[in-house]
Each structure stands twice: as structure tokens, then as C-alpha cells.
Regions:
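Interface amphipathic segments
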Residues: 1-469
Length: 469
């Protein structure tokens, strides 16, 4: 080990059980590391010594840390990424306690901002983890740069925290915090309150946002441990303006409100979780207000059921609302649906898709339908530039390799064009020929001379594709 390149100056005095060092000046490789006063109290057992330090200047950065380890010939230790992103840490305040168990009262200034603390800090002897319990506040800290999140900016908050962190992430945190402001996607949110517990695989608590462009209250639990996942949430949303929050550029005057209840449960491996999903999502009184248009959906109910029938996975997904009634049911696995689509496409249009390596799934039988209504009210409220005053429908099935899809839209209107009687049908015959049919009647705008000469246009398309052809 090389000679340690450090200088130390202090006025020392004390007795058998204590040492006092006043006017300390500590430098490492010419850079000032510490100025202040330290009192060390130690009983017979040296491993339980107690330190009180009044820090007028305590400085730390990655270069200093790395140089110190090199001079001490210590290998295999690296700073956690969040600490590296801080660039440097300058602490002014008091430190009381044992080396691994310290009470802090002061302020940390870093390249990302200043954080005031008053609490107990416990540091892992390997420097790969830490725990803090106490009060933390800041008037401005660049949290996005701390965690390498480009959409996050500055944050100002006041919080009581009991949390742990390892080399890469938070592992546990109990917190009650008031976030006075935080930047996300270039918008500054105000008046956010958090109260809950966070673990690696669980969040349980409440979130409240009372901002000019969103009033949101979330209460509940999300638990995603190794074997089971459960989500139980109650969400109240009012005066939500997606455009004002920079979530979209469309419909700048749109305001949304709703009450949502979510209860979902699943289990198994990540590949099995979707096939084991059960529960519901209920949206009450979804209200859309956009300029002079208002639209309300009294209730949207999504019901998800999964079980095993005759040794096969059976699923039923039902969607019920003022807007749409839909159902998907049968024996299948969600993971197999892309493979089925690849097989069918390759069978009739082999130039488009390569033959899948996975065999066609057995025991696949599913039926589906969807009936829509009141779509014109929704499209008018959202300024989509299209009206659907009629009641579109779609239905079909997949039984083994037998495919059938039918869709009918009585009418679609744009500003100047109307299309009537849109009929779409796709089915295969005896598992050999795939037939596609499309019919529509188009009324062109009469204020256009060319369109007026053409009049109405009827279109009929019929296409057949044969197996391996």
C-alpha cells in the first residue's frame, strides 16, 4: 500500500474514555475534505465508540472515493449509481452516533441540489446499502438526473421517511410526503401528497394530487411478489386535462373525470400470469367535457374470468357499457394467439410470413362479438372529425383452424363524405380457401365538380387465397 497522501491538523485533548479534536483541518491529495470539531467517546470495547462531529465542511466525490480506495489498496467496491449521479456531496451540520449508525442534522449540497435532513442514517459496511429514518426536505432537487429518468425534472418536497436502498434501487420505504412541486414532461405539478409503504414488490397507501389540471386520489394496494400478483385500487379523477399536462397535443380544452375501481388477481410464472388473470375494472360516471360538448358514460365494466375446464384453460372477457357490449370467450391461451395468427397468415399468404417454428396450438376455440352504440356523441366530443351515428357490430370465431370474422358499419360521416353499408367478411372454407369480402357505398361531396360528376360509388371486393398458393 502506498503512503496515504493526506494532511491532518487539530487541537487534541481528552482522557481515558474520550478524545476531543477542535479546529480540525483534513485534506486528501491537497483537497479539503473536513473542517470542524469532533468528540470521540469510547468505552473499553473500541467497536462501540461514539462520535459527535460538528461539520463546518465535509466533502466527498467519486474521484476522492476512488483515489482513497486505491491508496488503501481496497478493491471490489463501487459507488451505487444514484450516488455517482450526485457528482459530489458537501455536508454542513452535526453528526452523532456510531460509525455505522449516525444521527444527522444538517444539509447536503450536491450537483443536483440541496437536501436538508434530520434523522438516523445507517450505512452498510460494504457501502452497497443504506437506511434512513427521519425528516427530509428540499426546495429544488433534480430527481430525474439522480435516477437517469429524462422525463423527470426538479422536485421540491417535505417528507418523513423510513427507507432502504441497495446498490441499484430502493428496497423499502415508509413515507408521508408533501410534494410542493415536481416537473414531468415539462409540466410542473403542484400539491401532491403521499402516504404509504413501498417494497420491491408491493405498494400500499394513498396518493393525492390537487393540481389545477388534475385532481386525483388513489387508495389501495399493488402486490406483485414471486408467485401471486394482486391489485386493489380505488381511483377518483376530476378535471384531468391531458393536453395541459403535455401528455398529448390534441383536444387542448378536453377535461376528464371518472371514478374507477380495480380488483385483479393472478398467479404463476410471468408466462402464465395473463392466462390466470381474474377480476374486474369498473369505471363509474366517465365524464368528457370539450369546449361546448359534454359526454357521459354512466358505467364501464370489464369482467375477466379464467379457469381450467376439461384440462384446458378457459377464458371469458366481458365489456359492458353505454358505449359497447363485447365478449371474448373460449378455450385458448393468450400467449398462443400470435402463433395462431402467424400460422393462418403463412398458410394462405406464405410470402408475407415465415412458417412459425412452434406447432399450431391444440384445443383452441374462441368466440367473440362487439356491439357499439352512441359513438357519434363520443366522436363529436373528442373532435375526431368523423361521425358514426349508427350501430356498428363485429363478431366471429376461431375453432381450431376454422376462422370467421364479420363486421358491419351502417354509416360513417366525415365533413363532406358519407359511407354507407360497410360490410366486411373473412372466412375459410373447409380449411382450404380463405375468402375476404368487402362492400361499401360512398356518397361523395357534391360541392366538388369532379365528385359531383362521379356521383355515388359502390365498391365490392372479393378475394380468395388457397392453401399454399
Amino acid at each position: 500500500m502506498d503512503q496515504l497522501d493526506a494532511t491532518f491538523e487539530a487541537n487534541l485533548h481528552g482522557g481515558l474514555d474520550s478524545i476531543f479534536a477542535d479546529s480540525i483541518h483534513l485534506s486528501f491529495k491537497g483537497d479539503k475534505v473536513f473542517d470542524g470539531n469532533v468528540a470521540i467517546y469510547y468505552p473499553i470495547l473500541l467497536d462501540s465508540l461514539y462520535v459527535h462531529a460538528n461539520c463546518k465542511h465535509l466533502y466527498f466525490d467519486e474521484v476522492l472515493f476512488r483515489d482513497l480506495l486505491n491508496q488503501l489498496d481496497i478493491k471490489g467496491i463501487a459507488l451505487p449509481l444514484p450516488l455517482t449521479n450526485l457528482k459530489h456531496i458537501h455536508y454542513v451540520g452535526d453528526i452523532d452516533g456510531r460509525l455505522e449508525d449516525m444521527q444527522l442534522h444538517g444539509a447536503f449540497t450536491t450537483a443536483l441540489g440541496t437536501m436538508r435532513v434530520n434523522g438516523l442514517m445507517q450505512i452498510d459496511t460494504t457501502l452497497q446499502g443504506a437506511n434512513f429514518k427521519g425528516h427530509v426536505s428540499t426546495n429544488g432537487f433534480q430527481i430525474g438526473k439522480l435516477f437517469n429518468h429524462k422525463d423527470l425534472g426538479n422536485i421540491a418536497f417535505d417528507a418523513h421517511i423510513d427507507g432502504s436502498i441497495d446498490s441499484t434501487q430502493f428496497t423499502h420505504c415508509i413515507a408521508e410526503a408533501t410534494i410542493k412541486k415536481v416537473d414531468y414532461l415539462g409540466y410542473t405539478y403542484h400539491n401532491i401528497h403521499l402516504d404509504g409503504e413501498w417494497n420491491i414488490n408491493e405498494i400500499n397507501g394513498t396518493l393525492s394530487i390537487q393540481d389545477d389540471n388534475i385532481q386525483l386520489n388513489i387508495n389501495g394496494l399493488a402486490d406483485w411478489d414471486q408467485d401471486d400478483t394482486r391489485i386493489d385500487l380505488e381511483i377518483q379523477l376530476n378535471d384531468f386535462s391531458p393536453a395541459a399536462l403535455h401528455l398529448t397535443e390534441k383536444n387542448p380544452n378536453l377535461r376528464i373525470g371518472a371514478n374507477t375501481y380495480i380488483s385483479l388477481y393472478t398467479s404463476g410464472t410471468p408466462q402464465e400470469m395473463l392466462d390466470n388473470l381474474n377480476g374486474y375494472v369498473i369505471v363509474d360516471s366517465l365524464k368528457l367535457a370539450n369546449n361546448d360538448e359534454n359526454y357521459t358514460i354512466e358505467q364501464i365494466k370489464l369482467l375477466i374470468d379464467s379457469e381450467i375446464k376439461d384440462n384446458c384453460p378457459y377464458h371469458q372477457v366481458r365489456l359492458q357499457s353505454d358505449l359497447v357490449t363485447a365478449n371474448l370467450s373460449g378455450t385458448f391461451t393468450y400467449a398462443a394467439l400470435p402463433t395462431i395468427a402467424q400460422h393462418i397468415t403463412h398458410k394462405y399468404l406464405p410470402l408475407l410470413v415465415e412458417k412459425p417454428q412452434v406447432k399450431y396450438p391444440k384445443n383452441t376455440n374462441l368466440d367473440f362479438y362487439a356491439y357499439f352504440r352512441q359513438l357519434d356523441q363520443l366522436t363529436n366530443t373528442l373532435n375526431l372529425g368523423i361521425d358514426i351515428p349508427s350501430y356498428p357490430t363485429i363478431k366471429g370465431h376461431l375453432h381450431g383452424q376454422d376462422v370467421q370474422i364479420q363486421a358491419f358499419v351502417p354509416s360513417i360521416k366525415t365533413n363532406k363524405t358519407q359511407i354507407n353499408d360497410i360490410t366486411f367478411a373473412l372466412h375459410n372454407t373447409n380449411d382450404e380457401k380463405l375468402n375476404l369480402s368487402l362492400y361499401m357505398l360512398t356518397h361523395l361531396p357534391q360541392d366538388n365538380p369532379t365528385a359531383a360528376k362521379l356521383g355515388d360509388i359502390k365498391a365490392r371486393i372479393h378475394v380468395s387465397a388457397y392453401d399454399d398458393n
